[in-house]
Structure formats: C-alpha cells, structure tokens
Amino acid sequence: MKIFCLGLAGLLLAGTWLFSGCKRQEEVHPIGEFLPESEAFWNVVPRTSVLERIGIEFEFTEGPAWHPKGYLVFSDIPANTIYRWTGKNYVVVRQPSSQANGLLFQAGGNLLACEHGSRSITRLSPDGKLTTIVDSYQGKRLNSPNDLCRSSLGAIFFTDPPWGLPELNADTAKDLPYNGVFRWYNGETTLIDSTLSWPNGIALSPDERYLYVANMEIIPTGGEDQYDVFWMRYQLNAEGEVEDKSIFYKAPDTTLPGGPDGMSVDQLGNLFVSGPGGILVLDKDGTHLGTISLPIAATNMAFGPKDKELFITARSTIYRLSMER
C-alpha cells in the first residue's frame, strides 16, 4: 500500500490555494470479473482488459469526469469534497463542494457540478468564479440535481431526484411535486419528463439523437418492497428537443446488488450502466452483452482518452478498467 501526500504544496485552482489531504492509492492489481452474455461482449470489452482498484478509503464517490489534459475529477458527497486524480496522487480541488454529485467539463475548462447542498447546478471557471446555472423551475426550487450531460450545442441535460433531501420525497423543503428530467439551454429550462419516480444517471448517444436516463420504480407489495429498474431512451431532434420516448432496457433481476445509477456511452454507442449485478454493457439496440462484476456497487463512470480507459466510482473505491486491444 502506498500513501501519497502533497502536504502544504497545495493546488492553485479557482483563485484559492487548496491543500491535498493524504489519500491512499493502492498499488494497482486486477480485481473483479467479466460475465459475458454473448461473444459480442468481447468486441466491446476486449479479453485483454484489466480491472484495477486505484483508490480506497473514500466515503461515497460519484461524478467522475475526465479532462482532456489528462486527469480525472470526482466527488465524494459525504466528505463534501471534489478530488482530482493525476495518475500518481489525489488532491483536493474544492472543499467544501456543497455536496457535489455529478460533474462535467465544458469547453474552456469550466467544471459543472450538480450540488445537493445548494440544490443547483453551478459552473466553476478556471479563474475561480463560481456561477449558478440553474436552481429552479417555474419559480420552484429544484430537488437535488444528481447527474448531467451536455450536447455539442451547449445544452445541459440533467436529472433531479430527491436523494439530497433528508426526507427524500417526504421532505417539507421539496417544492416540485415530481422528480424530473430537464434540459437547460441558453438560460431557459425545459421539463423533459415528470413521470419517472427516481431518475438518476443520464447520457447522450455519440450522434446526440438519443438521451438515456436510468430510473427505478418501487412496487408496493404489502411487505418488502420490490423494484423495477429500467433505462429510458428519448429521441431528440436536431435542436435537442424530445420527439419520442420508450423503455430502452429493463433489468430482469433486481435482487442482485447494485442499482440504476450513473452511466457512460462509448464512441460506438455502447452503454456502460451501473445496475443490478454490476456494470451492465448494452449495445445501441438495448441488447445486454454482459456484465462487469465488482466487489462494491458502482455509482458512476466516465471514459478516459479514446475509450481505452473507463474510470468507475464505487462508494469507497475508485476503479480503472483498461481496455487496450
């Protein structure tokens, strides 16, 4: 085990000197299991792929985002911190982070964050300016923005479940009567869907024709609740407006560990989604190709350069899936 610490060297970001704490970065070693449903799985996840654990002892990690300059950022919600991983160590980017969850880089290096604490989406620019992008819809406060993605036009799509509210749907501070999927563009917020119970992860297809959203529905049984877990697909027009929607894939066994959370889409349109049993790999037609099983349930994931690496947040742990052919 190696421990990396920058001490008081710190990191200059957002106009403030921020200091790293000591975080353990494990010596990388293989872990996990590949469970193909068909041979097509190996066309997406090469047989030579290696799953490695690269960080431990966090509290609840989320929101990984890869920067083109070659580093990863992610959030630790209970720790109220956004970290950066350089390949050698972890440094604090922002603390407190207003319990940031989903993260996303814009052109120019702006970092967008879904904040549970402020119930908003904010933008942190390289010069340190923090700006609120959206915090309400039709005069009512958002619940707690969870995850987000953006189009080439600059539109931001995001989910707004109540996970950041202490009493969830029963919280007295909850203003909206639903948990929505939204689109923000040029200062205007549009409601895409108000019918999902627990919308969570969200991603766009490479051609931006489809928007995917993870969801969970609770089925009351009079005893222990059961769940429906499925992923929605929204068909978009050239302006990024929704024209149609349908269930893209429904998990057949929701008793397995893990649930519908974050996701990422590769350059060929294959989806990597956190779900029951691990990370489900789905092709662009919604066929389940196989599962990447982890010892800890994945919360979210993001591709590194050229789809050759997938960085996975899993509660206390950070994984890297190397997919060199």
List each model region and its residues.
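C-terminal motif of bacterial Sec signal peptides marking the signal peptidase cleavage site
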Residues: 18-21
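A short beta-strand motif characteristic of beta-propeller blades
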Residues: 51-55, 89-94, 131-138, 188-193, ...
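Blade/loop signatures of beta-propeller domains
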Residues: 26-50, 79, 242
